[in-house]
């Protein structure tokens, strides 16, 4: 399955592959 995106981020990058950080939402989500 896909990795879970749940890291807290603040306009930065996510350590989990396939995840992105939206500047308006401080949690990594699937891109």
From Swiss-Prot:
Keyword Disulfide bond in record: yes
PTM entry text: This is a cyclic peptide.
Tissue expression profile of the protein: Expressed in leaves but not in petals, petioles, roots and runners (at protein level).
S-S bridge residues: 5-19, 9-21, 14-28
Residues forming coiled coils: none
Cyclopeptide (Gly-Asn) crosslink site(s): 1-31
InterPro entries to which the protein is assigned, alphabetical: Cyclotide, Cyclotide_moebius_CS, Cyclotide_sf
TM region positions: none
Annotated keywords: Disulfide bond, Knottin, Plant defense
Tree of life domain: Eukaryota
Pfam families: Cyclotide
A GO biological process held by the record: defense response
The keyword Disulfide bond is assigned to this record: yes
Domain notes: The presence of a 'disulfide through disulfide knot' structurally defines this protein as a knottin.
Family: Belongs to the cyclotide family. Moebius subfamily.
Function: Probably participates in a plant defense mechanism.
Protein name, per record: Cycloviolacin-O23
Species whose genome carries this gene: Viola odorata
């Amino acid at each position: 399955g896909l990795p879970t995106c749940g890291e807290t981020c603040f306009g930065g990058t996510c350590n989990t592959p396939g995840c992105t950080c939206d500047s308006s939402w401080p949690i990594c989500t699937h891109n």
